[in-house]
């Protein structure tokens, strides 16, 4: 649920959630999203900005960092990253033609996240970090409550083929990133591994 901004402009970094579910862009003054999570290869961003907010930047702002520069040149101020744009095109076609659009994508993502959260809610070893009303369907954070056991889990998970589960430095523990491209089968396999780890270490 969006906050009541009382007339103030709402700016949102949607790098982790962009295209994971429908979004009413008119609710925002500016949306910024790195494409590397759900849209394409790293090295490109998508910006959706209200025209009246483009305005005049501060004098010291480098030309390439000005939204005005890119808006006035239709994002062609310099040579665009053609390969990244092409890959994004393929992802968008997949999302539309194979998945069935953003509502269908959201359904997939909610179901995937539920597999993991349902296990965490029942687990006697693992505990989710986020409050239920604030849970992400893209990044699931969890801990065992023991830093050494967390490290053991990350190590054994990597050996079993579950990589990049080490948690963000601000939270610690573990983080399972289950972006659009992650199939439900991948989450199911992770839950199976977590169940076995709990049985071996509880």
Q: Where do the language-model regions lie?
A:
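PLP-dependent enzyme catalytic core of the Aspartate aminotransferase-like
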Residues: 159, 168-202
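Conserved PLP-binding catalytic core of the aspartate aminotransferase-like
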Residues: 126-157
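Catalytic PLP-binding core of fold-type I/II PLP enzymes
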Residues: 1-26
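Short beta-strand-to-loop capping motifs
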Residues: 49, 142-146, 178-180
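Active-site C-terminal subdomain of aminotransferase-like
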Residues: 30, 35-117, 131, 200-202
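A short linear hydrophobic-aromatic micro-motif
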Residues: 125-129, 161-167
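Generic non-transmembrane alpha-helical segments
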Residues: 119-123, 152-161, 193-200
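General beta-strand structural signal in soluble alpha/beta enzymes
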Residues: 10-14, 32-34, 164-167
